[in-house]
Amino acid sequence: MAAIAFIGLGQMGSPMASNLLQQGHQLRVFDVNAEAVRHLVDKGATPAANPAQAAKDAEFIITMLPNGDLVRNVLFGENGVCEGLSTDALVIDMSTIHPLQTDKLIADMQAKGFSMMDVPVGRTSANAITGTLLLLAGGTAEQVERATPILMAMGSELINAGGPGMGIRVKLINNYMSIALNALSAEAAVLCEALNLPFDVAVKVMSGTAAGKGHFTTSWPNKVLSGDLSPAFMIDLAHKDLGIALDVANQLHVPMPLGAASREVYSQARAAGRGRQDWSAILEQVRVSAGMTAKVKM
């Protein structure tokens, strides 16, 4: 069993630390919330007066904090982790922070001779309690291999996202998609109500289409990702259908700002001559808008 320092005992961190204890690991904990520390001490953890004390003699130091500034302060501030850290220890940041902050933290740790990787998590606090988190590991092959037994005490699935900083990048993309889709789903649900359409009917239909399953696994693989833009569903038709939905929403006084923004992207694609291409070619349009080179010839 490993000697672990766990810093950050919030809604996610506390149950994650508890699962490490249940697996028999030696845990030294620190948090500014004394009650959160007491909760873990009652389960067998050892309290630390500061991050440096928590890190002393630890093989792994796990940080699970609300933002990147706090992570930096915990690592490099007064009585920070670096003051008590041994050079053979591995720091694992599991916080959700800005990727560029992660890159700088890892670089600064390396400059001091320390090892650090990023492993943000997916799923919810309920999964943190049951030890079924999705673990998104960004690190060297050696770091991922070394950390895996510790990480799997807190999760049920580990994805090796690639090198250092890649874990937080895939977490960022996943969060962007799920959070934006939550708002777009709300627009669709409210339009459903305004049209007096039974919600269960809409759910039944969408659960079997790209609307419910997402384009990454439905419309894209056999089209734009395979270099094929021949239309299964033309951008011109998608633009028309989206326009009808927005017109109906406007008549019913249902605000749909995300839908309107989406239609603008389709309008740009049509203006670029993509109207008769498959709707998955929207990926190429957004690439070009981002200053990148399209991967599929028009």
Curated annotation (Swiss-Prot):
One of its GO terms (molecular function) is 4-hydroxybutyrate dehydrogenase activity. This is 3-sulfolactaldehyde reductase. Induction: Induced during growth with sulfoquinovose. Homotetramer. Dimer of dimers. 2,3-dihydroxypropane-1-sulfonate binds at R123, N174, N175, Y176, M177, S178. It holds the Pfam family NAD_binding_2. It comes from Escherichia coli (strain K12). Keywords: NAD, Oxidoreductase. Reduces 3-sulfolactaldehyde (SLA) to 2,3-dihydroxypropane 1-sulfonate (DHPS). Metabolite profiling studies showed that the enzyme also catalyzes in vitro the NADH-dependent reduction of succinic semialdehyde (SSA) to 4-hydroxybutyrate (GHB), and that it could be involved in the metabolism of SSA, and other potentially toxic intermediates that may accumulate under stress conditions. However, the enzyme exhibits a 42,000-fold greater catalytic efficiency for the reduction of SLA over SSA. Shows no detectable activity on the analogous glycolytic intermediate glyceraldehyde-3-phosphate. Gene3D superfamilies: N-(1-d-carboxylethyl)-l-norvaline Dehydrogenase, domain 2, NAD(P)-binding Rossmann-like Domain.
